[in-house]
């Protein structure tokens, strides 16, 4: 198999909706070398439209179609922003790997499906660059969860022959990849990451997130509320499993708070931070533990969560992936650049041991342009 080496751009917009992350990387079958990154702002009105769809409010086919168009335009703008920053042109890029914006993910129903919006045809037309997108549905077609897909990238770039490592990504949802020598790679969503904390601080302080956990650190964890939250059936389900904003959202949190009407909002924030740390730690211990926990995503900047992980996992070194040369803020965008490289090379991109698919498969669809 001849691998299609070159410069790739990865585009990621996660469940936190805090911006569009774009990275440039030189990729071949041996090396993924990040060369530049760029964060493109997410328009407030567009964010609110997406939240309305994600949280199960009524929508229409027309509204979904308009969102698909608007997100395609936004992702193209983000790619162009990176090109301007680097001085490169479309002809310098082999392909763009675009994850799209997940608005619904339902892998466990009788008719499992996942939906990511952001018209890849439009991205290709506006940028003049071949686009690889729609990565998740091929895995689901083979019986997989369609998620998480990033563990295959973690294994390729952070796997170790002898050291027990777990990669923790704390985005809107938190997920782990277990890289344990002699065992198949596993990866799954542990539960809420930043999503509930972000929504709660927005409701009460109109801030997009709790910077440096300043608010959470002023509060006191309510152990009864924490115990009730951790009794949710999702946390006890066996892997592989995946979840998202369609489940862990403000409606879920409000239902949890019905029996706790007098808890101060600041204590709820502290309890949500502890929920993330506790649910992650539980899953890590169930997997057999690790020597090193490498953390990426926005939550790696949350000192409260990082310190609680260290306390809950004695004997484990907790450190950011940046220590190993991989930007934690750009990890997922890098992964989709790498997945685009795999697809363009005709190579599989999923790990059945992670997603539960019946076979390895080439992921996504290619949207080529003429004379690139």
From Swiss-Prot:
InterPro entries: Anhydro_N_Ac-Mur_kinase, ATPase_NBD. Gene3D superfamilies: 3.30.420.40. Keywords: ATP-binding, Carbohydrate metabolism, Kinase, Nucleotide-binding, Transferase. It is an enzyme of class 2 (transferase). ATP binds at residues 14-21. SUPFAM superfamilies: Actin-like ATPase domain. Its EC number is 2.7.1.170. It comes from the Bacteria. GO terms for molecular function: ATP binding; kinase activity; phosphotransferase activity, alcohol group as acceptor. CDD domains: ASKHA_NBD_ANMK. Pathway: Amino-sugar metabolism; 1,6-anhydro-N-acetylmuramate degradation; Cell wall biogenesis; peptidoglycan recycling. GO terms for biological process: 1,6-anhydro-N-acetyl-beta-muramic acid catabolic process; amino sugar metabolic process; peptidoglycan turnover. It catalyses: 1,6-anhydro-N-acetyl-beta-muramate + ATP + H2O = N-acetyl-D-muramate 6-phosphate + ADP + H(+). NCBIfam families: PRK09585.1-1, PRK09585.1-3, PRK09585.3-2. Belongs to the anhydro-N-acetylmuramic acid kinase family. HAMAP family: AnhMurNAc_kinase (MF_01270). Catalyzes the specific phosphorylation of 1,6-anhydro-N-acetylmuramic acid (anhMurNAc) with the simultaneous cleavage of the 1,6-anhydro ring, generating MurNAc-6-P. Is required for the utilization of anhMurNAc either imported from the medium or derived from its own cell wall murein, and thus plays a role in cell wall recycling. This is Anhydro-N-acetylmuramic acid kinase. The lineage of its organism: Bacteria, Pseudomonadati, Pseudomonadota, Gammaproteobacteria, Enterobacterales. The gene is anmK.
């Amino acid at each position: 198999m001849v691998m299609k080496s070159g410069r790739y751009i990865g585009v990621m917009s996660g469940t936190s909706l805090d911006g569009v992350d774009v990275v440039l990387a030189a990729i071949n079958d041996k090396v993924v070398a990040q060369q530049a990154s760029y964060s493109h702002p997410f328009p407030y009105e567009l964010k609110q439209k997406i939240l309305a769809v994600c949280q199960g409010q009524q929508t229409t086919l027309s509204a979904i179609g308009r969102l698909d168009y608007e997100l395609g335009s936004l992702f193209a703008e983000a790619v162009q922003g990176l090109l301007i920053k680097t001085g490169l042109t479309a002809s310098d890029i082999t392909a763009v790997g675009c994850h799209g914006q997940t608005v619904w993910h339902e892998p466990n129903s009788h008719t499992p499906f996942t939906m990511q919006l952001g018209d890849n045809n439009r991205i290709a037309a506006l940028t003049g660059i071949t686009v690889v997108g729609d990565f998740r549905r091929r895995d689901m077609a083979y019986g997989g969860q369609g998620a998480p897909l990033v563990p295959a990238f973690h294994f390729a770039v952070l796997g170790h022959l002898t050291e027990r490592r777990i990669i923790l990504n704390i985005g809107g949802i938190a997920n782990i990849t277990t890289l344990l020598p002699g065992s198949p790679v596993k990866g799954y969503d542990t539960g809420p990451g930043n999503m509930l904390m972000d929504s709660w601080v927005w409701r009460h302080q109109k801030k997009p997130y709790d910077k440096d956990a300043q608010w959470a650190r002023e509060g006191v964890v309510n152990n009864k509320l924490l115990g009730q939250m951790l009794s949710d059936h999702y946390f006890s389900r066996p892997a592989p499993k995946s979840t998202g904003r369609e489940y862990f959202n403000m409606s879920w949190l409000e239902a949890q708070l019905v029996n706790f009407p007098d808890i101060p909002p600041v204590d709820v924030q502290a309890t949500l931070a502890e929920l993330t740390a506790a649910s992650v730690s539980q899953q890590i211990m169930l997997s057999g533990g690790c020597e090193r926990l490498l953390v990426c995503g926005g939550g790696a900047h949350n000192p409260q969560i990082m310190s609680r992980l260290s306390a809950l996992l004695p004997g484990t070194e907790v450190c950011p992936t940046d220590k190993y040369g991989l930007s934690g803020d750009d990890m997922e965008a890098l992964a989709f650049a790498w997945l685009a490289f795999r697809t363009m090379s005709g190579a599989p991109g999923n790990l059945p041991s992670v997603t539960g698919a019946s076979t390895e498969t080439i992921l996504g669809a290619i949207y080529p342009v003429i004379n690139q």
